[in-house]
Structure formats: structure tokens, C-alpha cells
């Protein structure tokens, strides 16, 4: 815990209740009350949800399955009348190098001509497989997708503030998600920003960058 009163580290497990949603690439939590200081009985749900990328060994890169889970969590929060705000963040640090990241965009190892490819299995324990091994698991009969753009539209259509909490690297499609959020709060120590979509022949940033106010 932080040395400051009532200020947690990146994630204080005792402040959050895990939502009953089956996930492999994301985590989804509801903030719970500490008691009188929060104005509600201890343990009662507060109107804030935390949605986090959970692929830290891959700098929280997303694949189609990740995007499906992210969309589902955001939609649950959007449709829940007792949720007033959403924190979009990421878990970490990486077990490889102890580095922190928000999201590094799409997992290029499974990108094809039609978009990012679904895999036959979705276990998070296989994140460290080599590119050749990942390509062998691509679901051949299923179209690739680039539906992170659907997530961006959902974020803009949600009538509740979405706060991007940036614990580290945010690049490419991850950078676009940060821009599309209503507010971004970044770690002074670990946060770094980079837009690399053009380097991989993508224009995911087109929607997000149009929202920048200069």
C-alpha cells in the first residue's frame, strides 16, 4: 500500500470485488466501500468498475479474443444503472523484465491480410509461444478482425466517464484507446507514449486522434 492515507498502489486487492464474468485476457472488478470514509457500509459496492488488460508478458497486446472480452466488460458497465464511472487500465508488471505497460496495441504475431486472427485455444498461459507456434493455432475457417474500432465507438457512446489509468508503455492501438477515453491519468515514473500504427500498415489511430483538442 501507499504511504499516503487512502491511496493504493496500482491495485489493492482488498478494495475490489471480482465480477462474475469468465475472462482470460482481461480482469473486471467492482470497487467496494471501506466504510464510513466512503459513505457506505463496509464491503458494499461503489459505483466504479476497473477493467484491466491482463497479458503483461506481452505488454498487454490484444488479440481478437482480448477485444471480445474488453467489449463485453465495457458494455456491462455501460448498461449497469449502478455504475457511474469506468477505470480502464492494465495489470503488471511483466514477469519477464518487471516492466509496466497499459497496452501495446494488436498482437502482430497473429495478424493476417484479413485482420487479427482468432486462435483455436485462448489460454493466457500460452502468451509466450513463438510466432510460428502461434500461427499454427490460427483458426483457419474464421475471418480475421480489426474490431478494436468497435470498442472505440462503444467508449465514445458510453454516457459515463471512462478514465484511462496508464501504468506504463502505451503504443499503437493502446495509445488510441487512451486518446478515446474521457480522461487519462499516467504514471510519472513508468508511462511512455508512442504511436506506431503506420509502421504496421494500420490506421487505428484515425478515430482517436480526431478527438484531440489543440
List where the protein language model places each region:
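Glycine- (often His-adjacent) and acidic-residue-rich active-site loop
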Residues: 15, 58, 90-150, 201
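Conserved small/polar residues in nucleotide/adenosyl-binding loops
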Residues: 212-214
Amino acid at each position: 500500500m501507499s504511504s499516503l492515507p487512502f491511496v493504493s498502489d496500482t491495485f489493492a486487492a482488498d478494495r475490489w470485488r471480482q465480477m462474475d464474468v469468465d475472462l482470460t485476457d482481461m480482469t473486471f472488478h467492482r470497487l467496494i466501500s471501506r466504510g464510513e470514509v466512503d459513505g457506505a457500509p463496509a464491503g458494499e459496492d461503489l459505483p466504479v468498475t476497473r477493467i484491466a488488460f491482463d497479458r503483461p508478458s506481452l505488454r498487454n497486446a490484444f488479440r481478437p479474443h482480448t477485444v471480445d472480452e474488453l467489449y463485453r466488460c465495457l458494455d456491462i458497465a455501460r448498461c449497469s444503472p449502478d455504475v457511474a464511472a469506468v477505470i480502464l487500465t492494465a495489470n503488471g508488471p511483466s514477469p519477464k523484465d518487471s516492466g509496466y505497460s497499459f497496452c501495446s496495441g494488436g498482437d502482430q504475431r497473429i495478424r493476417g491480410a484479413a485482420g487479427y486472427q482468432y486462435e483455436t485455444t485462448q489460454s493466457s498461459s500460452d502468451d509466450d509461444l513463438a510466432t510460428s507456434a502461434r500461427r499454427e493455432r490460427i483458426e483457419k475457417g474464421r475471418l480475421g478482425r480489426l474490431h478494436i474500432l468497435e470498442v472505440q465507438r462503444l467508449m465514445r457512446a458510453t454516457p459515463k466517464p471512462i478514465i484511462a489509468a496508464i501504468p506504463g508503455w502505451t503504443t499503437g492501438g493502446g495509445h488510441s484507446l487512451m486518446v478515446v477515453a474521457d480522461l487519462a491519468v499516467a504514471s510519472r515514473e513508468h508511462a511512455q507514449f508512442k504511436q506506431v500504427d503506420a509502421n504496421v500498415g494500420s490506421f487505428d489511430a484515425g478515430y482517436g486522434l480526431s478527438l484531440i483538442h489543440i
